[in-house]
Amino acid sequence: MPAQQWDSPPEMQIDETKNYSVSITTNRGTIELELYPQHAPQTVNNFVYLAGQGFYDGVLFHRVIPNFMIQGGDPTGSGSGGPGYRFADECDGNPLRHERCVISMANAGPNTNG
């Protein structure tokens, strides 16, 4: 069954002053995440919305590089699927960096988040 698609990003439904905790349950254990909307409000709102819609339910990590990274969130399993919309990058002024144990959103280039 194809993944659900939307025409535009969801309206803001989160409180940008709060941090959010997320648990991703896998067959290898549970991954606990903290999301920081004060640094990337659209990205956190997008993740919270799609998770609430069941968009990620049953989705596999389609790319695994041992001792480096895992990539998931694409219901097609190809690495190029998404919810049907895009939104702008939120990196300017963002103090968070790509370090060990950090979650980031992959995209297809500038302003192609979704």
Question: Across the structure, where does each feature detected by a protein language model lie?
Answer:
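Cyclophilin-like peptidyl-prolyl cis-trans isomerases
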Residues: 1-114
